[in-house]
Amino acid sequence: MANILLLEPAYKNKYPPLGLMKIAAFHKHVLHDKVFFSKGPIREGLTDITTWDKVYVTTLFTFEWKRSIEMIEYAKTLVPINKIVVGGIASTLMPDEYEKATGIRPVTGLLNEPGKLGYPGDDTIDSITPDYTILDDIASYYHYPYENAYFMYSTRGCGMNCGFCAVKTLEPTYIPFISIKEQIRKIDAASTSPKKDLLLMDNNVLKSCNFEEIINELIELGFGKNAIYINPKTKKPQKRYIDFNQGLDAYLLTDAKAALLSQVAIKPARIAFDHIEDKEVYVKAIRTCARHNINTLSNYVLYNADAFSGKGHSYAADTPQDLYERLQLNVALAQEINSQKADTEEKISIFSFPMRYIPLDSKERGYISKKWNAKYLRAIQVILIPTQGKVGTSASFFYTAFGKNVDEYMMILDMPEYIISLRGEYKKIASLSEEANANRFAQYQYNQKIVSEWISLYMNLSATELNEFQSIIHKNKFTKDLIFNTTNPTIIKLLLFYMPVSELLKLFDYFDNHECRLHKEIVVDYCAHHFPAVLDRLLNYLLQIKSTSRFSFAFVKYVGIDFINKLYDKADDNSEILKKLKSLNL
């Protein structure tokens, strides 16, 4: 009996490592080995095993390169290099890079060929029933969001060969049907209760010539429409759901296939909307689902992508405007379809998940395509923060968050991050007192003055000035030196809204030690006399600091008496900032 260690890097991910779970089952039930699973380095006290005969390290995201390499290096501290096996998605996509960095040649692709791991029968690992019990090894410190679900494949491969997608490398051969009955039976037999939901990880299930057989098996397994699950703890009934998690291909969704899908407990139906050029096909697919009462829909909206080919088409690089059009289309489409439904009918909802493209060989998340820039990509992230990356079909939310039209949307993308967050409509909170709501409303009104001031300056830029301004901000790096890239007064004022507090302090220090009369006069006049609120971030910073030794007080010469008075009024009597101000006799 060998001691086997399974390692997953300590990045956050939604789904458990299916490959390691299958390897665990192979070692436990075929080779009768002892297996332990750890997410990140082994935590003290969780296992009494001190020596290992083999260590497996999985890799998932290419942009988690650093953590994956660190995990492999950690494995080297436990066993000799010839006892380490590296595999998974990232190392399959970048085998040469992983070998160069670690000295270990990864095992690539699926474990469906003999000899990949050096054991008799290792060609069966991909089809083996996953061992869910290994998740108990990490239960004290990590839980995957979707643990109460079966993770299965009813097909393998895709066949569409989209340029941005890894499936053609990971699963090059299309397999149209894999029965999951026996796997679910074995999982249930090893558990105290069945699992509630079913996540099918198929990359293109609609391509299968056995699609009807797949649907019939799902119904037989208890996942027909309106299927019920009895919670083993509460004994209360809950609805079961099927999620074809990797999405359904709009090009392959026919009325007949939608009719079959409507017979199972699918929620949501995920339909990819990878490019605006797929608009007609996508809209047709949504309408087809709606006709068959598949009412909870979602879509992956790829953005920041370069030109690519796939599905028999060639696609141009997408633009920021394309993203808005696709998101707005979903809002309008849901409104239109729901307006045609009777009051008693269930309405449809369409949730969009914008997904930023990262090249398959990228070791970091920071890729910027030709039609995008760093500022716009960050702005999209900021807009999506309140909804954790999801865009629903609420028209009021969408038009508030993304703008009433493309022009307003493009202006929002140019906004400083904190001003993007200050936008929105005021809503009274019933659970709060009148005084608390009054204070919230006063703050809201004040925030809108800041937003309005920025918009006023921005809208006063001519086309030439706007181009100059955007050339400065689109790199999304805001230092004091930016204002010296222009002599335009409006642009100089606008740039003050972008500077971090640390850079504002450096700017005032620079004014104190250099001759830059034009810029100094514009900044001082604007901050001290025209719009002191532009310095509110600096004010809040100064009120919170514990030590004044990290910066000079040159700013007091340039911020205006109103700013100094606010500091005096709001600072605690014993605060460092107040002591310093008094020492300066201000």
Where are these regions (language model features)?
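Structural recognition of alpha->loop->beta junctions
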Residues: 97-117, 258-268, 325-408
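Canonical Radical SAM [4Fe-4S] cluster-binding loop centered on the CxxxCxxC motif
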Residues: 18-19, 144-182
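Glycine-rich beta-alpha loop elements in corrinoid/cobalamin-binding modules
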Residues: 8-12, 16-148
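Conserved C-terminal portion of the radical SAM core fold
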Residues: 54-56, 83-85, 198, 265-270, ...
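Radical SAM enzyme core and accessory elements
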Residues: 3-6, 28-37, 47-49, 81, ...
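Conserved SAM/AdoMet-binding glycine-rich loop
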Residues: 6, 183-305
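Residues that mark the start of a beta-strand
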Residues: 1-3, 32-34, 148, 161, ...
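Surface-exposed amphipathic alpha-helices with a cationic face
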Residues: 28, 71-80, 166, 219, ...
